[in-house]
Amino acid sequence: ACDNGRCKIYNLDFPDVIALRQQLLPAGDREQNIPCDLKDTAWFGKIDASGGAVFFASGVFYYFLTQEVRELVRGMADAFPGGVLVFDAANRTAVKMIAKTWLKTAKIKDVGAYFAVSDAAKEIGTWDSRLQVTSRGYMLGYNDLRDPSVSGFFRFLARVGDNGMKMQIVKIRF
């Protein structure tokens, strides 16, 4: 588990997303929503990592280049030793599907440069020796979908997402 019962939890996202999140899901105890440009580490100064810190970046890295995610992760490892970063990721095929409309609007041709992983531990783990990387399937890694109340079609979609598109929740301990 990431939470030791004392650590602070930080939700990281772009300011407009955090504003909406604040309306729909206000931060709980020990939790803080941080509106920021993750490419600018000025937000590091807002973090109190004493007692531990867990960072969530949900749905964010699909819009970042792999190099930008690598630099952020290394910077966080420097600034928050003992901290944890949790985010969702997917393979190249899934990222193309997820970002298709956005990429077309932004006139981006090289989708291959955008952050995508198939095997998080193997691919991200090589970025820095301090990183302890684990991942679980986005759907099947956390839920037992064999319950009769779960439709066969939903189970099929979960298998396609987790196995075919390598959709996953990644946890990096610094």
Report each predicted region and the residues it spans.
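Alpha-helical subdomain
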Residues: 1-174
